[in-house]
UniProtKB/Swiss-Prot annotation:
Pfam families assigned: NGF
PANTHER family per the UniProt record, alphabetical: BETA-NERVE GROWTH FACTOR, NERVE GROWTH FACTOR NGF -RELATED
Keywords linked to the UniProt accession: Disulfide bond, Growth factor, Lipid-binding, Metalloenzyme inhibitor, Metalloprotease inhibitor, Protease inhibitor, Secreted, Toxin
Tissue expression: Expressed by the venom gland.
A Gene Ontology molecular function term of the record: nerve growth factor receptor binding
Quaternary structure note: Homodimer; non-covalently linked.
Subcellular location: Secreted
InterPro entries given in the database record: Cystine-knot_cytokine, Nerve_growth_factor-like, Nerve_growth_factor-rel, Nerve_growth_factor_bsu, Nerve_growth_factor_CS
GO CC annotation: axon; dendrite; extracellular space; synaptic vesicle
Disulfide bond annotation, renumbered to this chain: C14-C78, C56-C106, C66-C108
Protein's name according to its UniProt entry: Venom nerve growth factor
Source organism per UniProt: Naja naja (Indian cobra)
Task of the protein: Nerve growth factor is important for the development and maintenance of the sympathetic and sensory nervous systems. It stimulates division and differentiation of sympathetic and embryonic sensory neurons as well as basal forebrain cholinergic neurons in the brain. Its relevance in the snake venom is not clear. However, it has been shown to inhibit metalloproteinase-dependent proteolysis of platelet glycoprotein Ib alpha, suggesting a metalloproteinase inhibition to prevent metalloprotease autodigestion and/or protection against prey proteases.
PTM: Not glycosylated.
Amino acid sequence: EDHPVHNLGEHSVCDSVSAWVTKTTATDIKGNTVTVMENVNLDNKVYKEYFFETKCKNPNPEPSGCRGIDSSHWNSYCTETDTFIKALTMEGNQASWRFIRIDTACVCVITKKTGN
């Protein structure tokens, strides 16, 4: 909306919002729900864990789905994709660095309408 490229007529098919967030729980790379450590103690200093996440502002920016998709031939919607990053976590009573799932982008998913 207020991004400079919008002045050039360029628009994203899916609007996203990015922010630094904290987490209390997450899904690890094995699919387990783990507790994310709020504070990390390294060299007698306490650090807070932050994660940079990108999420969809709206799963349907247009009534027909993603912006700019021909809705007469395609069904579409916006959804988040993710990646794995390391975080200090607890599973049971064991603390360790694990890869956890973080939302990193908002993308458009399309499927061809049947009968066209």
